[in-house]
C-alpha cells in the first residue's frame, strides 16, 4: 500500500513541475511540449481506491520552481559553394577547309640571240656554171673567189668542183641553265632535229650554259617560252584544327549528351582542273637557195655571141665554153644558147613531210608544187630532199596543231560538319535522357575526329579506279613504236569534218596497188570485208592496248591470228568500201585495259614526222 502512495506522489510532483514554466513565464493557456517521450503509469483497476494516509502527504517536501528559458533559434549553416570544375581543353575538332586554284607562270629559254661567224658558203659546180655567176650568187667578186680557192687563169671550172665563198654571219642563241634542244627549237619555231643538224649535234645532246647554238635558216624567234599552269584547288575536306582551343574553367554542370557531327550537303563551287595544251609543229624544214633552171636564149636573126654574152652577164669565152661554140663561126638561127644557172628557193624536207603539207605551208597547190619538181602528187619524199618552190609562193611558217586535253574532274566532297553553335541552338532546353542503341554502345570518352565520308548511294555500286590517262600521256606512250603504213598525200585528216561527221583516222591518197605495211609488231585481229563502208579491212592488235586499222584495201595478204612484224605487208591500196579514188584509211586506237573501249587517237601526233 505504501508503494502505491509513493507512486502517486511522484506523479503529482511531475505534473506540478511541467505546469510551473507556464505560470512562471506569465503565459497562461500555452503548454510546453516536451521533446522526449512520456510513459504514463498503468491506471489502477476499477473499484480500487487509493487513499493517502493523513499526515503522510504533508510530510513530503514541496518542490521548488525551476526557471526555464527559451532556447535561441538554431541558425541554418550555409553550405560552401561547389568547387569550380576545370574542364580540359577539348580535342582538336575537324574543320572544313578548301584550297582555291592558283595560276603559276614559268618562263624558260630566256637567253639572248647574238650574231656569230657562220659557215663558209660552198657551191658545187654544175654544167654551164661560170665563176662570175657563182660570185654574184655568193655576194662576192671573182677576185675574192680566186683567192679563196687558189684558182689560176683561165679559171676553168670542173663539174662537181666545190667553190668556197666568203664566210657569212649567222644568228645564234646563248644557252641558259636548264635549257634543252627541244625547248630552244620550240622558241625558234624549228625542229630539234634541224637545230641539232645545224650545230653537228644529236637531238638529245647535252648543252651547257653559255654555249652558242646556230639557228637554222627560216627560224622565227617567238621569244622566251611562258608556260601557264592552273593548279586546281583541293575540294573541301575535314581536317583537324592546327591549335586546340584553350582550356576553360566553369562551374560544374550536369553533363550533356555528347553531340555527333551532322552531315549536311554543302553547296560548293568546284574548282576548274588544269588543262593541258599540246602544240605540235610539222613541215618545219628550212628554206634554202638552190640552183634553178639555166637561162636559155633562142638565136634570132642578127644575134651575136657578144650580145648574148652581155645579156647573160658573162664573158664571150665563158659563154662559148659552156655551149661548146667556136667564136669564129656565126650562130645558127633557132639554136639554143644556154646561159648561167639561176637561183631559186627550195624547201628542205624533214621526216614525215608530204607534198600536201608542204603546199599548205607555202600557200600553193599540190599540183603546182609537184609540176615544179617533176614529181607525182602522191610521190614519197625523203629527209634532206630539196623541193623547189613555185613562183609566187608565200611562206606561212610551220604548220601548228594544238590539242587541248582536260583531265577528269575529281568528285567534290559535298558533306560537311555542322557548326557546333548551330547544333546547340536546336538542342532542347530541358535535359533529355540518353538511350543508347543496342547495336552501338554509348562512348565513354571523346571520339577522335574522323574524315567525313559521304553515305553510299542507293543506286549502283561505285568502283574506284585509277584516273584514265590523258590524251598527252597516250600520245607519249605511242611515240617511237609505230611507223607509217605508207607515204602519200593526206586527203582527210583526223577530227570533226562537218555537222555530224568525224574522221577517226587519216585518209592517205596512194596509187592503186601500193603496198600497205603493218605499223608495228602485232597479231591480226580481223581480216575481211564485213564492216560496212570500210571495204577490205585489216585490224592489227599490238602490245600495251594499241590497235591499228587499214581500210579500203584492194586485197589482203594476212589471215586471223597471224603474227606480223613492223613493215610486213598486209595488203595493197584500193578503192573498196565506197570511196571514189584509191586510198588508205588508217586508224590508231588505244584502250588502257581490256575492259575499256578503244579510243581513237590522231596518228599524225604519234607517228614519226
From Swiss-Prot:
Composition skew (Pro residues), residue ranges: 79-93
Annotated InterPro entries: Cell_wall_metabolism_enzyme, Dup_hybrid_motif, LysM_dom, LysM_dom_sf, Peptidase_M23
Listed SUPFAM superfamilies: Duplicated hybrid motif (SSF51261), LysM domain (SSF54106)
Biased composition (Polar residues): 25-38
Signal peptide: 1-24
GO biological process: cell division
PROSITE patterns: LYSM
Entry keywords, A to Z: Cell cycle, Cell division, Periplasm, Repeat, Signal
Biological role stated in the UniProt entry: Required for efficient cell division, cell polarity and normal cell morphology. Facilitates remodeling of the peptidoglycan layer and, thus, coordinated constriction of the cell envelope during the division process. Plays a critical role in maintaining proper cell envelope architecture during growth and division. Required for normal envelope invagination during cell division and to establish or maintain outer membrane connections throughout the cell envelope. May serve as a regulatory hub coordinating the activities of multiple peptidoglycan-degrading enzymes during cell constriction.
Protein name, entry field: Cell division protein DipM
Organism, as annotated: Caulobacter vibrioides (strain NA1000 / CB15N)
Gene: dipM
